[in-house]
């Protein structure tokens, strides 16, 4: 979007679904949640003592004051059987004083207690699921003092000749309807998309992602982050979930947030630089900051990461935009987004093992040359004045984040970044002449595009030209004709206003299909989105 200081103006008319979140309003969860969950660190080894010790440590270390005010129980908190009246029961060995007592105790300390259930007949751990008991379970949780529900999706099987996706939609829609009738409703975290995140074919995943923002406030969209005792690379696990999150920016808005899973700052497989990177990336995404770690044992360096006030402010920014890819090379990602009050965010990630020197021109940030931009490093607080480019030296797996203040005379931001196919990862590329195609992303300005307020896409390599629809997609001198105007839809389609056909990797342009992998694209942050 174009931003002039704090004023956000419309590019392409935006159509918002009538129902935003569980209560048709973003006010239930206007910014992403912050807190603690036991799963990635302790899995089923949760109990009353753990949560009391965690709360005490969060108070003494300043995490509560920093905003981490939610403590969420995950799977295995229940008894294996429901009570005689069919209500859920807690495990009395793990929680001798009971869940209501724990919720009240935590509330007096300034925390909110959240809980876990499953849309199937059993939870992932084999405990009683919610299927057939949704209203009763919701009432039970509310009576216990719970205000946040994470609903998993294990053991869901199609009923009434529905497809699996239709079954998930029916069950999560039912939960949405149950919750919206409560006063107040519970915050609703949906895990349904995680059961459809198949990189071989993303169509079903996107079909689920199309409806989850209308039902809840956040969604666990893909694979679980590596648990503390898990095998494999914790950094690779973070990068997998980071990658999935980059595909979903179009869905996020205030009141609904994409959830790439827990922060794992005490994982033994991570370097300090990697721990910093996960936090910086999640904050740049305005993702939930839910820590799964042994809080009393966190080091001073780990706590300093989690308490970084500047990055928390970015995460909690009221615009709720997700940082998107301005550029992608073999090892380096450059992400940008607009912030409230007219500032711009720049995040630069080194995915590789080398130590590159990265040059980021102001145009990649959606800005213009010849202005004096005040740039603040959000890790060390260093301030510099930027006019043409910023030069960054990045350690292996490091992430630098900068907040950029725009002077009044240079306060216009043009949405700028790569246009990439979310299935292949390839970038729309200006091939000179009239040709346009898709190639591996290589950090070139021929793959960086500006999106104008009229829906014109200009390659940064020649901004007088526009992406043009004809018998093929091409790059032509801009004329203002409708065959150069494009609309970005919530489905990820980039539809031409003249031909009503969609940009397509492989053929250039073709009839629009339903969530076809070849027609789903990521665009820069700030481009308004047309809802179907």
Curated annotation (Swiss-Prot):
Q: Does the keyword rRNA processing apply?
A: no
One GO CC annotation: extracellular region
Q: Which PROSITE patterns match?
A: RICIN_B_LECTIN
| Entry keyword set | Disulfide bond, Glycoprotein, Glycosidase, Hydrolase, Lectin, Secreted, Signal
Keyword Transcription (UniProt):
no
Biological-process GO terms, alphabetical: carbohydrate metabolic process
List the CDD domains hit by this protein, alphabetically. beta-trefoil_Ricin_AglA (cd23425), GH27 (cd14792)
Which residues are connected by disulfide bridges in this protein? Answer: 44-76, 124-154, 427-441, 466-478
User: Which residues carry attached sugars according to the database record?
Assistant: 47, 91, 121, 201
Entry superkingdom = Eukaryota
* Entry's EC annotation: 3.2.1.22
InterPro entries reported in the protein's UniProt record? Aldolase_TIM, Glyco_hydro_27, Glyco_hydro_b, Glycoside_hydrolase_SF, Melibiase_C, Ricin_B-like_lectins, Ricin_B_lectin
Family affiliation: Belongs to the glycosyl hydrolase 27 family.
User: What does this gene product do?
Assistant: Hydrolyzes a variety of simple alpha-D-galactoside as well as more complex molecules such as oligosaccharides and polysaccharides.
Q: What name does UniProt use for this protein? A: Probable alpha-galactosidase A
Q: Which gene encodes it?
A: aglA
């Amino acid at each position: 979007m174009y931003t002039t200081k704090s004023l956000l103006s419309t590019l392409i008319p935006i159509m918002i679904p009538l129902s935003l979140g569980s209560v048709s309003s973003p006010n239930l969860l206007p910014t992403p949640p912050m807190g603690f969950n036991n799963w990635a660190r302790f899995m089923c080894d949760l109990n009353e003592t753990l949560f009391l010790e965690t709360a005490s440590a969060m108070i003494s270390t300043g995490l509560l004051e920093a905003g981490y005010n939610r403590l969420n129980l995950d799977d295995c908190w229940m008894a294996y059987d429901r009570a005689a009246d069919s209500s859920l029961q807690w495990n009395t060995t793990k929680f001798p004083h009971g869940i209501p007592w724990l919720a009240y105790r935590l509330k007096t300390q300034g925390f909110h207690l959240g809980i876990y259930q499953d849309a199937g007949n059993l939870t992932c751990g084999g405990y009683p699921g919610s299927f057939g008991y949704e209203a009763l379970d919701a009432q039970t949780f509310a009576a216990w003092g719970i205000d946040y529900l994470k609903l998993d999706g294990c053991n869901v099987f199609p009923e009434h000749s529905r497809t699996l996706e239709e079954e998930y939609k029916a069950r999560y829609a039912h939960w949405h309807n149950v919750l919206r009738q409560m006063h107040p409703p519970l915050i609703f975290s949906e895990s349904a998309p995680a059961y459809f995140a198949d990189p071989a074919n993303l169509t079903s995943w996107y079909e689920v992602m199309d409806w989850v923002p209308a039902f809840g406030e956040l969604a666990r969209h893909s694979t679980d982050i590596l648990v503390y005792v898990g095998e494999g690379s914790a950094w690779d696990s973070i990068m997998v979930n980071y990658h999935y999150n980059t595909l979903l920016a179009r869905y996020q808005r205030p009141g609904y947030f994409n959830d790439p899973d827990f922060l794992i700052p005490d994982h033994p497989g991570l370097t300090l630089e990697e721990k910093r990177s996960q936090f910086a990336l999640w904050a740049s995404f305005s993702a939930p900051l839910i820590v799964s770690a042994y809080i009393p044992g966190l080091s001073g360096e780990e706590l300093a990461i989690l308490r970084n006030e500047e990055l928390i402010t970015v995460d909690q920014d009221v615009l709720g935009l997700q940082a998107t890819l301005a550029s992608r090379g073999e090892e380096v990602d450059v992400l940008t987004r607009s912030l409230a009050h007219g500032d711009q965010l720049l995040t630069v990630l080194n995915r590789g093992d080398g130590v590159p020197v990265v040059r980021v021109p102001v145009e990649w940030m959606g800005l213009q040359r010849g202005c004096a931009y005040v740039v603040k490093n959000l890790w060390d607080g260093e301030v510099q004045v930027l006019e043409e480019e910023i030069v960054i030296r990045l350690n292996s797996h490091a992430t630098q984040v900068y907040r950029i203040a725009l002077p009044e005379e240079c306060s216009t931001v043009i949405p700028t970044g790569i246009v990439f196919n979310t299935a292949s990862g390839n970038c729309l590329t200006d091939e000179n002449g009239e040709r346009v195609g898709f190639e591996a992303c290589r950090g070139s300005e021929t793959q960086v595009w500006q999106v104008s307020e009229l829906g014109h896409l200009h390659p940064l390599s020649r901004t007088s030209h526009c992406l043009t629809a004809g018998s093929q997609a091409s790059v032509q001198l801009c004329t203002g004709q409708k065959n150069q105007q494009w609309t970005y839809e919530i489905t990820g389609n980039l539809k031409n206003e003249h031909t009503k056909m969609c940009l397509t990797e492989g053929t250039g342009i073709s009839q629009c299909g339903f969530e076809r992998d070849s027609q789903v694209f990521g665009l820069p942050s700030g481009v308004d989105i047309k809802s179907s």
